[in-house]
């Protein structure tokens, strides 16, 4: 049985997960409908569909993992469920970060202004940048997958008092965890770099605008600010997600602390929930469709 605090926190996390599924499903449906209508899929549409779909899987995996650990711990650790979830989660997690990073790079190349020859070459050949990112994804996935296999083989299952708990030597587990996420961290660092360069581009553009009309904000400035807000929100929410997942994994060593585990689940669920609605509000097409849905609901 859960305590009152644990029950309340789990309810909050479940609501976050539900909103995350609804928000990301909406994003995927709107872009798929636009694809079917125009018989053409833009790069932004492709990235949004991929990001939304992968996040739906992430939410379901987080929820399934949390409920299985809380209510069926013996079956969870004694069966192959933990291995299945680990392999699927590792793959989907890489895809989610890759789509988010690719979207960040796309906004950066589209909006930023630099005279550097490498930047200008990438700006004209965006597809080359995505081929490079795809290579990074495949490389990091192969490395991470091999470490997941290693961790699962090294895991020792101990049956005591009808409870199955997986024990790993903590130092080795920490090393494995770092290597498991090295690809994700590398992609995340690309987003940080894109955000920093966008801020630099905005600063340079603002200095150039100082010679113009005072207080005038042109469309380029607005685009910079909008993209920077999007990137910063992703960075903050992804850090929360990473912290939440780390807390959940650490709780393997302290399975009796259910409150801490549920807190990790709640923290991790903030990212797919909140960022989906940030995407909806920051994208004009998604925002218009969302307003139409809200207006339609008023008639019921």
From Swiss-Prot:
Q: Which residues are glycosylated?
A: 161
Recorded phenotype for the gene knockout or disruption: Mice fail to avoid cycloheximide at low concentrations and show a lack of cycloheximide-induced action potentials in a principal nerve innervating taste receptor cells of the tongue.
Q: Which UniProt keywords apply?
A: G-protein coupled receptor, Glycoprotein, Membrane, Receptor, Sensory transduction, Taste, Transducer, Transmembrane, Transmembrane helix
A biological-process GO annotation: sensory perception of bitter taste
Task: Name its cellular compartments.
Answer: Membrane
Listed GO cellular component terms? membrane
The entry's family comment says:
Belongs to the G-protein coupled receptor T2R family.
What else is noted? Several bitter taste receptors are expressed in a single taste receptor cell.
The protein's name is: Taste receptor type 2 member 105
State which gene encodes it: Tas2r105
């Amino acid at each position: 049985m859960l305590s009152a605090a644990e029950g309340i926190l789990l309810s909050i996390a479940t609501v976050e997960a539900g909103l995350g599924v609804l928000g990301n499903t909406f994003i995927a449906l709107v872009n798929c409908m636009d694809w079917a209508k125009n018989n053409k899929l833009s790069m932004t549409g492709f990235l949004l569909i991929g990001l939304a779909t992968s996040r739906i899987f992430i939410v379901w995996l987080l929820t399934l993992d949390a409920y299985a650990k809380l209510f069926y711990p013996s079956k969870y650790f004694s069966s192959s469920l933990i291995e299945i979830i680990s392999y699927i989660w590792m793959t989907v997690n890489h895809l989610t970060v890759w789509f988010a990073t690719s979207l960040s790079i796309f906004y950066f190349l589209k909006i930023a202004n630099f005279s550097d020859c490498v930047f200008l070459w990438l700006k004209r050949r965006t597809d080359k940048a995505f081929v490079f990112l795809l290579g990074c994804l495949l490389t990091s996935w192969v490395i991470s997958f091999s470490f997941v296999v290693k961790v699962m083989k090294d895991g020792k299952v101990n049956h005591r008092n009808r409870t199955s708990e997986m024990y790993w030597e903590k130092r080795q587990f920490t090393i494995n965890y770092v290597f498991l996420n090295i690809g994700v961290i590398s992609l995340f660092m690309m987003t940080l770099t894109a955000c920093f360069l966008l801020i630099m581009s905005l600063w340079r553009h603002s200095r150039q605008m100082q010679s113009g009309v005072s207080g005038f904000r042109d469309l380029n400035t607005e685009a910079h600010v909008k993209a920077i807000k999007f990137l910063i929100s992703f960075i903050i929410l992804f850090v929360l997600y990473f912290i939440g997942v780390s807390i959940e994994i650490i709780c393997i060593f302290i399975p009796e602390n259910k409150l801490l585990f549920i807190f990790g689940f709640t923290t991790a669920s903030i990212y797919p929930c909140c960022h989906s609605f940030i995407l909806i509000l920051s994208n004009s097409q998604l925002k218009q469709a969302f307003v139409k849905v809200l207006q339609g609901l008023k008639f019921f």
